[in-house]
Amino acid sequence: MMSDNKVERLLEELQITNPAGYELVQAARQVVYSVVPNASERVMYGGFMFSGGEQFCGVFAYKEHVSVEFGRGCDLQDPHGVLEGSGKLRRHIKLFTPTDIKAKFLELYVDAAHRQV
């Protein structure tokens, strides 16, 4: 698990300004690190971008949900029908509650995204 001071500062800010979002972000980060223990993490675009050589996903907190973004999500298989987005490349999974992490098979999609880069 490699992160930097910017990651810690953004987490601290989130904890104060969006406690529910902070908890979901932390849970999503745990999933990423459980799948890719050596992932590196940095702050980009107001969220947390994860790389394992190449960027494979990002975690972003919004007022009502947390979004896990996949830059090449268009190439991911979606057997559970949870990927959202209709753009050319990007897809995302919206998390509203901690139970969404398992219900939307986040670990499976993070693993698939990491394997495709």
Q: Language-model segments: which ranges?
A:
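Charge-dense, helix-prone N-terminal extensions
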Residues: 1-117
